[in-house]
Amino acid sequence: MLIVKKFGGSSVADKDRIFNVANRVIEDYKAGNDVVVVLSAMGKTTDGLIAQAKDINPKASKRELDMLLTCGEQMSVAYMAMALESLGVPAISLNAWQVAMHTTSVYSASRLKKIDTERIQTELEHRKIVVITGFQGINKYDDYTTLGRGGSDTTAVALAAALHADACEIYTDVEGVYTADPRVV
């Protein structure tokens, strides 16, 4: 069974939370499943990067902001792969360029067009947990683009579809279980 699991920034906000997620992921792996993990940036990393960018240039281009903002997810996936390896499980972190997540060229609000799954499939065949950056892609110029807020959820669902996954699990730390958008109901 192939499972795509997405965890948001608060789920990987610090070392303890990273290891908590790693242990949850390992349970599925040890049950014999192939596992792909999609992560957002840790905690408030994205907000911090935006604030720092505005301090440097309040009129920074969306292209440069996208280049900067992809760093948050790259940190998260590298830390997660390191945590998994420290727990004795083979893992690899991959970013949007390495996976070839092709998007439109609209900076800060791109749409996913195509995902090349070959690299992911190869790593899964080697029984590795594949940890992938959410929220980002690359355009036809090989520039990083971002999918906007909530983009990691989009990444997880798109990867699950492209990989023909058996399940796509999106974890969040809200109180209770919602069957509708609480802002609407």
Regions found by a protein language model. Name each.
Residues 1-185:
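Nucleotide/pyrophosphate-binding catalytic subdomain
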